[in-house]
Amino acid sequence: MNYTLLELVQQVTGELGVSRPTLVIGNNDPQIIQLLALVNRLGRDLSRQYEWQRLNTEYSFTTVQGQEQYALPSDWLRQIPQTEWDRTSQWPLIGPATTQEWQIYKSAIISDGPNLRFRIADNFLEVDPPTGDLNLSFYYISKNWIDAGGGVTRYTYAADTDKAIFDDSLMVTGLKVQWKASKGLDASFDLAEFRTMLDTIKAQDKSAQKLTLGGLPRNILLTEWNVQDGSFPS
């Protein structure tokens, strides 16, 4: 179970040897106000660091005939590449298109094809051609790294009971680094510990594919690689 905001700040202040607060949100102590600002920045920075499995989110919607632009989810931080699919036709979307390619799609005499093309521009997912009644789906990384309970997530701490999704030790060490740096203190030891911890937690965050040092597995089926050029058996 992860620390609440209050527990996190109490742990950090205890390790730093400064006064431990009884509340964080609504506290008028400049030290606590600064720690709150720093921990919010820390969480946002960590969100951008990696494809965290707890921030991995699926989104789907149905297209409308003639509509080209569809708003991205409100908590969208970044796209997970090559997850864009047309589930109705069971085809992947083609893209993301560059601006030059998109101009070709919109302007060329012949530009239509059987598959939808897409790009992300101005916080919209744009599709071409604008076909209706298709169920489109993709995965993205959410910017909401705070669990407020009851299925509610946030981008910024709003209550002392809010919890970050990140490892407690990582948050404690990272917050100590930021606090010491803001005070002009030597944070080199804590920074080295934070970087090592971050690499370890990234590696443990989700599963991994099996790697082999041998050659590729042989295909027992007939393919272009194992069919003779001529003189086929009668």
Stretch-by-stretch model annotation:
Residues M1-S234:
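Glycine-enriched, solvent-exposed interface loops adjoining structured elements
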